[in-house]
Amino acid sequence: MNILIINAGSSSLKYQLMDPETGVVSAKGLCERIGIDGRLNHKVGENKVVKDIPMPTHSEAIAATLEILVDPVNGVIKSVDEIDAVGHRVLHGGMEFFDSCIINDEVIKAIKKCIPLGPLHNPANLMGIEACQKVMPTTPQVAVFDTAFHMTMPPKAYRYAIPTEYYENDSIRRYGFHGTSHKYVARRTAELVGKKEFKMVNCHLGNGSSMSAVKDGKCMDTTMGLTPLAGVPMGTRSGDIDAAVVQFICNKYGMSVDECLNMLNKKSGMLAISGVSSDFRDLEDGAKNGNADCALARDKFCYEVAKYVGAYAAALNGIDVLTFTAGVGENDTAVRAAVCEYLGFMGVKIDPELNSKRGKEMMISTPDSKVQVWVVPTNEELMIAQDTAELVNAAK
């Protein structure tokens, strides 16, 4: 089975052609500078092709993608008919979507309804969907929402303690993000530990970071909120702060609310504390060379991650498994070690030699650790492909 996975941005479109059963990616690429001049970056194995192709809209980007996929020299299929379905990543499903779904007119209307919650991403995601419908009208399309996995949270976890009318009229509540990654890791961890009923905390740590408390495969709580700004501090995002900070800064420095939020999203986090970089590798190098601010940034990050693990362990009445995923979680051995050191009171013990390995799926805890600690490399595209295949096969 061939699933085409689409992740559409405002001026870009990423794609992969994948077998959902094996996870084998036969081709992948990026259409960039859509609406400007257009460029296609296509990769099959180690072979790369770059072409300048006019792409006034996402429709031309999809057409260029399909054309190169069936190209006699650079393609991997003979006909577009060999694509069984298309899976679209959609950022925000609001309170409309609790799971992935086959796209129809009603689904498109509901995604549009969620635009106020995802004003930057949802319109672009819709452009990708509508472009595929135009170019591939008979191929099933599936929407996979970044928020859907977290929709199993109970009200005590997702409701904000603000007047009810804002929830009822404007759907203001905790939603959470990185849901496709959290879902993949939860499902994969169940396979690794050999059972479906267990309690875990997953740490998706990268330039953007979020954590989730998961019980028996279902999300009970997550760190991000109405937007991805909440939770632990990130590469350039502040994470949790006192909401009154916004008013204080706006009043003192004459900023608009939008300018202040831009600062909190793009100029804060590790970049702000270190004064050097948002990249954890740069912070590690800086700390090793005696830069106290780089060391503080990393210490702050590990402290906040460990604090949330402790909070979620309390919320779940204990945990069986702790998982690390995404760029930092999979590769930054010092971050994993520091987080787990905080959790010694929970009986968490990791093997330094096992933890020294980067980017590999493996258990890094010791045999006598009371909590299994795993590194589980994420694969959001495979999760999208599997969701798409399951829905399309069920509809046959």
Q: Residue spans of the language-model regions?
A:
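Adenine-nucleotide phosphate-binding core of ATP-dependent small-molecule kinases
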Residues: 262, 269-273, 280-315
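Short glycine-rich, Thr/Ser-proximal phosphate-binding strand/loop in the N-terminal lobe
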Residues: 3, 12-56, 225
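Internal helix-turn-beta structural module
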Residues: 295, 299-317, 329-396
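Glycine-rich phosphate-binding loop of actin/hexokinase-like ATP-binding domains
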Residues: 149-252
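Glycine-rich beta-strand-to-loop/alpha-helix junction loops that act as flexible
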Residues: 8-9, 88-91, 205-207, 319, ...
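Short beta-strand-loop/turn "lid" adjacent to the catalytic site in phosphate-handling enzymes
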Residues: 69, 73-121, 142, 149-157
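Catalytic phosphate/nucleotide-handling subdomain of diverse soluble enzymes
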Residues: 215, 220-256, 262, 326-357
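Phosphate/pyrophosphate-binding loops at sites that engage ATP/ADP/AMP, CoA/4′-phosphopantetheine
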Residues: 68-83, 189-194, 309-320
